[in-house]
């Protein structure tokens, strides 16, 4: 599907509402057992931790790696030291599938993130039943709808999920803090234009709070880029660079750069 420049998020959300209308109501089960992602990053603060993403395609890049065996890719991520695996489940724009999340969650021991544009409780129930232990809520999706964001955030926590709350600017970061979010992402990609500026992560660091952990998302391909955010961020989310890597283990380990923390 073609998207007009500047209309990325608007177009995706319109399609998402159609998808949800057809989505069946599911009786929610129990969240899969694994370690707590927040605690893990707090306890492993000497290195920048990596959320490794399984992503076949994207609106900005088109096809990335359509032939990938998603389970093998996820297992390789786990063996190479990823702290969590992010799984794209949007079928239209990212060529993802909820079944990918099911298959990966059944074959790894570490946390899995349902990466999608979540705007409804039906999606959260589905994520739990597919094996996710963390979901993504994007502040930009809930423009002028803070009560809805708060409701979905609290609902996810009540089920035993962790929530990665994604922000892009200072105003959205303040909303994440207002929510009481413990895991906060800073997306270097503007979801309205899809442009990526790594400096975006750096610019927001003066507003960070000590109790939360912070993840820099998008635009990180090398150890040098990882190093730029390593002192103030606890982790990074990386998809394209790992999906295209010819030496996945080395690529992932190179991204886990040393951090300067209060302890070292």
Swiss-Prot record:
Its EC number is 4.1.1.48. PROSITE patterns: IGPS. One of its GO terms (biological process) is L-tryptophan biosynthetic process. Pathway: Amino-acid biosynthesis; L-tryptophan biosynthesis; L-tryptophan from chorismate: step 4/5. One of its GO terms (molecular function) is phosphoribosylanthranilate isomerase activity. HAMAP family: IGPS_B. This is Indole-3-glycerol phosphate synthase.
